[in-house]
């Protein structure tokens, strides 16, 4: 038995930042076969909803709580976006460099990375990979303003909802988080080779069951 100790050296952890965003447009088979680097990504906000309790009463007492299904939505903010995003945002090319709106929106997945730090190694402690599946972007406002003496770049913003995908042995999910401080480096490198591509293969987003296979190999 040992007494609990708070704020030990090396255990004062924090999470910060967002970088290395990748967009994966879903194909007709439900796979995410090709990734595109998302430059200018500034914010990804994950906003779970649901999981609300509905109380049931019997015998003049609270009998139990029924929980509603939890869903994942969120917001993406960026200064720019890859060309592949157009079809996820309801646009279609009718000629080179010419786009029309109000078109069907494609489902997408994405990957982004956040930084893990502590009181010893600061931001070099580690990172988390966030994988999102079955996302669908909603129409969003774009505000264009004149250039003035306080110039600002336009920040684009999109809200998204998700449809979970199957995971063997668990309920369907729309997101996976991988912690680099807890996964073997060789297995993490193998997963990143799939997510980001390499000299021989295109970047793609593996489905959850394949992620498990890679990290459990």
Spans of features found by a protein language model:
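Oligomerization/assembly interface segments of phage tail-like spikes and tubes
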Residues: 46-48, 56-85, 150-165
């Amino acid at each position: 038995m040992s007494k609990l100790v708070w704020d030990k050296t090396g255990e004062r952890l924090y999470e910060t930042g967002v970088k290395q965003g990748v967009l994966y447009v879903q194909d007709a088979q439900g796979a995410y076969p090709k990734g595109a680097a998302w430059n200018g990504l500034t914010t990804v906000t994950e906003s779970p909803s649901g999981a609300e309790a509905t109380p049931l009463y019997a015998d003049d007492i609270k009998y139990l709580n029924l929980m509603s299904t939890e869903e994942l939505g969120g917001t993406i903010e960026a200064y720019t976006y890859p060309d592949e995003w157009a079809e996820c945002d309801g646009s279609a090319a009718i000629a080179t460099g010419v786009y029309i709106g109000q078109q069907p929106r494609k489902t997408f997945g994405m990957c982004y990375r956040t930084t893990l730090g502590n009181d010893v190694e600061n931001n070099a402690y580690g990172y988390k990979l966030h994988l999102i599946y079955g996302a669908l972007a909603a129409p969003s406002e774009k505000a264009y303003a004149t250039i003035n003496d306080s110039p600002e770049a336009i920040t684009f913003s999109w809200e998204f909802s998700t449809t979970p995908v199957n995971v063997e042995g668990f309920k369907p999910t729309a997101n996976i988080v991988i912690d680099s401080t807890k996964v073997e480096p060789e297995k993490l490198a193998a997963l990143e080779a799939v997510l980001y591509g390499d000299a021989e293969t295109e970047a793609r987003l593996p489905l959850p069951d394949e992620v498990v296979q890679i990290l459990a190999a």
